[in-house]
Amino acid sequence: MRCLPVFVILLLLIASAPSVDARPKTKDDIPLVSFQDHAKRILQTFESRYDCCKTFECCHWG
């Protein structure tokens, strides 16, 4: 029970600390969202090609 007040104080200090990036942004930084969108697009392309090849209508990989 003696640890509980210390734990609460530490949580309050962590929550109130300012958010600072570990490294400054450069002009080449790309947001993570664009990587996720790109990955989704690639997966959708493979899925559409797989569906097409299941029916043997237009099986082309290129």
UniProtKB/Swiss-Prot annotation:
Post-translational modification: Contains 2 disulfide bonds that can be either 'C1-C3, C2-C4' or 'C1-C4, C2-C3', since these disulfide connectivities have been observed for conotoxins with cysteine framework V (for examples, see AC P0DQQ7 and AC P81755).
Record propeptide residues: 23-48
Keywords of the record: Amidation, Cleavage on pair of basic residues, Disulfide bond, Secreted, Signal, Toxin
A Pfam family it matches: Chi-conotoxin
Source species of the chain: Conus pennaceus (Feathered cone)
Residues recorded as bearing Tryptophan amide in the entry: W61
Tissue specificity remark: Expressed by the venom duct.
Recorded GO MF terms: toxin activity
Protein name per UniProt: Conotoxin Pn-014
Compartments where found: Secreted
Entry remark concerning the domains of this protein: The cysteine framework is V (CC-CC).
Keyword Signal: yes
Signal peptide: 1-22
Record's GO cellular component terms: extracellular region
InterPro entries in the record: T-conotoxin (IPR031565)
Family: Belongs to the conotoxin T superfamily.
Domain of life: Eukaryota
